[in-house]
Regions:
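Amphipathic alpha-helical transducer elements in NTP-driven molecular machines
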Residues: 12, 40, 88, 118-125, ...
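Short hydrophobic/aromatic-enriched beta-strand-loop microsegments
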Residues: 25-33, 82-83, 102-109, 157-163
Length: 175
């Protein structure tokens, strides 16, 4: 992060703590769900000018249920090469800690919220009833009870591993 000219961060308030800890003075700009399209245009323009940019997220891997997909898409369309530093996405970390079968799995990211799109949520849950592979989902804490209830109704007595705060101080796994 010291070697790039600009850091695009999901939440600059969060990322500044990490940068300060390591005394990294690289300028930052925000890149998140709510500005991803217009900010990607800006970042692609900067890349065309020869600016080296790193994209970081609060946790996990950019583009895997975190901002990044739009920027990579626009870079590809502009013929700009993108590289990724290997590191675990939360879904892979959770899978490896779950105790569930890891050979074949299905990653669904976040289910649509009931409030936003109840029919689409139910359609996905109905599809998951037929899924035999280990299923990985993300969920926000304030939706967790409702989602677990819906999963129990849709999937029955299927084994579950609930992982939270992975790689952080309060990491926990419940099976």
């Amino acid at each position: 992060l010291r070697e790039v000219d600009l850091i695009a961060a999901e939440d600059t308030r969060h990322s500044i703590k990490l940068l300060n800890h390591f005394d990294i003075k690289t300028p930052m700009t925000s890149y998140h769900e709510y500005n991803k399209v217009e900010k990607a245009v800006y970042l692609v323009d900067k890349l065309r000018e020869g600016v080296n940019i790193a994209l970081i997220t609060d946790a996990g891997t950019p583009g895997i249920s975190d901002p990044g997909e739009e920027l990579v898409r626009q870079c590809a369309a502009a013929g700009i090469e993108v590289t990724s530093l290997p590191g675990p996405a939360a879904c892979i970390t959770a899978l490896s800690m779950s105790g569930l079968p890891t050979r074949r799995f299905c990653f669904e990211a976040f289910l649509p919220s009931e409030r936003a799109d109840k029919k689409e949520r139910q359609r996905i849950l109905d599809e998951l009833k037929r899924e035999t592979r280990t299923i990985i989902l993300y969920e926000a804490p304030h939706h967790l009870v409702g989602t677990l209830t819906d999963l129990r109704e849709a999937l029955g007595n299927r084994p579950v591993s609930l992982c939270r705060e992975l790689t952080k101080r309060y990491e926990s796994v419940m099976r």
